[in-house]
């Protein structure tokens, strides 16, 4: 009986001591968050996983953000939304040198995992880095280098990872989050291009998990995350500290340039000077040609991309693809051309009136463009029509002389 009592007393102590047993693993896993860079592809920052093993002298970085620039079909694949990225692994020193050369900081978060959990993650990363496993289809806001790193930590460690709320009560949209980085980096023209080509799927409000497609938001999520009821991050430090360079001030933003152009074209449109009218003929040809090209690109990306980011794009309501052929005959004074521009004028006014009701955030630089379209289509729609002279006419002359 005493033996049973002793066993019953020692049995729970065995599990308590096992649970309290310190991690004797020499593995160290950390998340690396890189600050935004000057180039568009680096504007949103970057994420990677660092694995260190002091006993074997291993200090490697696993990076899901590499792709092949030299692929001859890269542009065609990019247009279709087929962006093949890969997991690459290389030394931590090489990683730091790369970001030092780009003048970008690196923040490191040490993850508090058991020895078994760290080994599982390390093994999964090694398997994922094999040539037959390393490639994946990249989708900017749903499956990228940051979401891959998060999913490996959550799914491959075996730990029960929980994230606390990191977004405000009124959640931002994907476009709001993207704009934050573009504005901070002074990427005004890139912001316009993104807003023109990406449809209203980007205007959906993000969930807590979806916000972590951005490196800073994953870092913020890990700061307050738990793993098996304890803090997931034990320590946070600067692996590479570089002061960010503020973007240089410039007036040459899309809004300023297009607003100035709107004023100039508006004044010239009311001029009766022949040189001004000749200039406007050339301007209209180029302007509507560019609008038509933008419309063709919008519709093409909407139709052929396999993802959804370019679908349901309301910018097609003002950048009409039909402008492309019309641009070559814009100077002609024809009835059908007059009717076309009257229709364009009405459509442009309707788009401007419905601006705040469109379920897509339209870039503010589009407003002066709409003004230019409205002015030029109004004047083109009210030009005097040149009457055609019949090509074949028969002139009959009658003589007043009496017939003898």
Predicted segment positions?
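Residue-level signal for alpha-helical transmembrane segments in multi-pass membrane proteins
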Residues: 11-18, 268, 301, 329
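Soluble extramembrane regions of membrane proteins in the secretory/endomembrane system
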Residues: 21-242
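Short, highly charged low-complexity linear segments
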Residues: 206-220, 252-256, 354-363, 381-388
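Generic detector of multi-pass transmembrane helix bundles and their immediately adjacent loops
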Residues: 271, 282, 286-404
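Core alpha-helical transmembrane segments of integral membrane proteins
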Residues: 225-308
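Hydrophobic alpha-helical transmembrane segments
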Residues: 197-205, 231, 258-262, 288-291, ...
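A generic alpha-helix preference that emphasizes hydrophobic side chains
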Residues: 15-18, 45, 146, 293, ...
């Amino acid at each position: 009986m005493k033996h049973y009592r002793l066993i019953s007393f020692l049995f729970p102590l065995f599990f308590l001591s096992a649970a309290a047993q310190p991690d004797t693993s020499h593995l160290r896993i950390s998340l690396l968050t890189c600050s935004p860079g000057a180039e568009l592809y680096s504007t949103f920052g970057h994420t990677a996983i660092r694995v260190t093993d002091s006993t074997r002298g291993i200090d490697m970085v696993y990076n899901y953000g590499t792709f092949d620039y030299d692929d001859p079909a890269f542009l065609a694949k990019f247009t279709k939304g087929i962006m093949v990225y890969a997991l690459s692994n290389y030394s931590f020193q090489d990683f730091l040198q790369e970001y030092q050369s780009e003048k970008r900081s690196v923040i490191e978060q040490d993850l508090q995992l058991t020895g078994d959990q760290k080994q599982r993650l390390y093994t999964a990363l090694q398997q994922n880095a094999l040539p037959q496993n390393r490639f994946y289809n990249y989708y900017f806001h749903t499956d990228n280098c940051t979401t891959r790193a998060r999913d490996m930590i959550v799914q491959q460690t075996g730990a029960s990872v929980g994230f606390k709320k990191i977004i405000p009560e009124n959640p931002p949209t994907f476009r709001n989050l993207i704009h934050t980085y573009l504005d901070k980096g002074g990427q005004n023209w890139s912001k316009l291009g993104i807003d023109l080509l990406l449809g209203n799927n980007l205007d959906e409000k993000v969930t807590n998990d979806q916000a972590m497609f951005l490196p800073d938001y994953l870092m913020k999520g890990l700061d307050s995350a738990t793993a098996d009821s304890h803090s997931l991050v034990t320590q946070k430090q600067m692996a590479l500290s570089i002061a960010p360079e503020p973007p240089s001030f410039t007036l040459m933003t899309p809004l300023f340039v297009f607003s100035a152009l709107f004023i100039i074209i508006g004044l010239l449109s009311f001029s009766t000077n022949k040189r001004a009218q000749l200039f406007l003929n050339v301007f209209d040809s180029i302007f509507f040609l560019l609008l038509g090209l933008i419309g063709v690109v919008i519709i093409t990306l909407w139709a052929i991309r396999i993802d959804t980011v370019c679908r349901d794009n309301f910018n097609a309501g003002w950048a009409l693809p039909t402008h492309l052929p019309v641009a070559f005959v814009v100077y002609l004074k024809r009835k059908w051309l007059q009717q076309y521009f009257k229709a364009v004028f009405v459509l442009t006014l309707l788009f401007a009136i419905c601006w705040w009701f469109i379920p897509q955030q339209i870039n503010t630089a589009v407003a002066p463009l709409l003004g230019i379209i409205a002015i030029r289509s109004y004047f083109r729609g009210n030009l005097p029509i040149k009457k055609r002279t019949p090509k074949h006419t028969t002139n009959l002359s009658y003589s007043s002389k009496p017939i003898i």
